[in-house]
């Protein structure tokens, strides 16, 4: 069961890493979105006309996804390395994995809901996919961490 938990946490890292790399691969689409005028699929939102704010939000979200991936991979390794340890040692090894889940939820709540939806893409077609991705990462990470922390080893 302990190895399986490590695999689940590694999947959080892999998912977050894929999202971050996809963000970088889609930089041309981001350039078009930052340059889009209200009415080009966007509502006239608080910061919709600010390219600097758009790029800052993009960089912050992408950086956060890389951080989540790194913390999740560390958590997965810690869990795997402690798979034969005592219960107390294994509980300590869960720390980074739990942080990965917490950071995923923070990414969803703070970055996607507040920055992405609240300031830029709220109510637009462009924002729907970003919100869905963030929700999927946050909710699956939370469920994984509940499993890792709550299911008996």
Residue positions per predicted region:
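Membrane-interface interhelical connector segments
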Residues: 27-53
């Amino acid at each position: 069961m302990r190895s399986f938990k490590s695999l689940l946490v590694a999947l959080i890292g892999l998912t977050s890493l894929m999202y971050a790399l996809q963000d970088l691969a889609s930089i041309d689409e981001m350039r078009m979105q930052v340059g889009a005028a209200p009415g080009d699929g966007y509502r006239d939102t608080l910061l919709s006309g600010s390219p600097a704010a758009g790029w800052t939000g993009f960089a912050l979200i992408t950086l956060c996804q890389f951080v989540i991936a790194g913390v999740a991979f560390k958590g997965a390794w810690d869990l795997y390395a402690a798979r034969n340890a005592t219960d107390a040692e294994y509980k300590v090894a869960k720390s980074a994995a739990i942080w990965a889940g917490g950071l995923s939820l923070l990414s969803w709540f703070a970055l996607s809901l507040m920055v992405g939806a609240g300031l830029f893409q709220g109510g637009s077609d462009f924002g729907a996919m970003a919100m869905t991705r963030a929700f999927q990462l946050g909710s699956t990470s939370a469920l994984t961490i509940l499993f890792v922390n709550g299911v008996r080893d």
